Regions:
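Conserved beta-strand in the GNAT
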Residues: 68, 76-86, 103
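Conserved active-site alpha-helix within GNAT-family acetyltransferase domains
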Residues: 115, 127, 139-158, 164, ...
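Conserved GNAT acetyl-CoA-binding A-motif
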Residues: 126-136
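A conserved beta-turn-beta hairpin within the catalytic core of GNAT-like acetyltransferases
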Residues: 77, 88-99, 109, 156
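Conserved GNAT-fold acetyl-CoA-binding loop/helix
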Residues: 17-53
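Conserved N-terminal entry element of GNAT/NAT acetyltransferase domains
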Residues: 1-14, 25, 169-174
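Hydrophobic adenine-recognition pocket in adenosine-nucleotide-binding enzymes
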Residues: 8, 102-104, 137
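Conserved acetyl-CoA-binding loop-helix of GNAT-fold acetyltransferases
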Residues: 104, 110-123, 146, 150
Length: 174
């Protein structure tokens, strides 16, 4: 069976939103998904953009990007997706890619689709001269950890992720 990675289109948004919910269910955090299809569409295709796009990206670059893989047996159905955005290293003075979501539907796992999506983003990094490609993974997701190790990715064990949200964010801001 042949799988092809391609940039997402507006027609993919509904299925991508469904896969975001599927991913959240897998990660035991479905109650945290409040984003709508419309918000996803706007971030990907609706004109939400960085006001000052980096020189090595198209002018008016979108705030969010996505690549998908079609189900070769079911036209119009998606097998997997990668949602990503640009980040920047102040130490290296270069842009990179931050992978927000990587998801392959259960019936397609173990066939190399996750690696194919990761490889496509790595190709974008190298073609554009970006110097890093990074993401987070839950410590219990052994299947994903195995994939990441197999491609040569290394964990950044010395870092701790912090987050401010909701009332704590508002309280601190005020």
């Amino acid at each position: 069976m042949s799988f092809q990675v391609r940039p997402a289109t507006p027609e993919d948004v509904a299925q991508m939103h469904s896969m975001i919910i599927e991913l959240a269910e897998f990660e035991k955090a479905v109650e945290e998904v409040i984003a709508t299809e419309e918000q996803l569409y706007q971030a990907l295709f609706g004109g939400t953009s960085f006001s000052n796009s980096p020189a090595n990206t198209p002018s008016g670059a979108p705030a969010l990007y996505a690549h998908v893989i079609d189900d070769p047996k079911n036209s119009g159905q998606l097998a997997g997706m990668a949602i990503w955005f640009l980040n920047y290293s102040t130490w290296q003075g270069e842009y990179g890619i931050y992978l927000e979501d990587l998801y392959v539907r259960p019936q397609f796992r173990g066939q190399g689709l996750g690696k194919s999506l990761l490889k496509e983003l790595a190709k974008i990094c190298t073609a554009r001269g970006y110097t890093r490609f990074q993401w987070w993974v839950l410590h219990w997701n052994e299947q994903a950890l195995d994939v990441y190790k197999s491609i040569g990715a290394v964990p950044m064990d010395e870092w701790i992720v912090y987050r401010l949200t909701g009332d704590k964010l508002t309280q601190f801001a005020n």
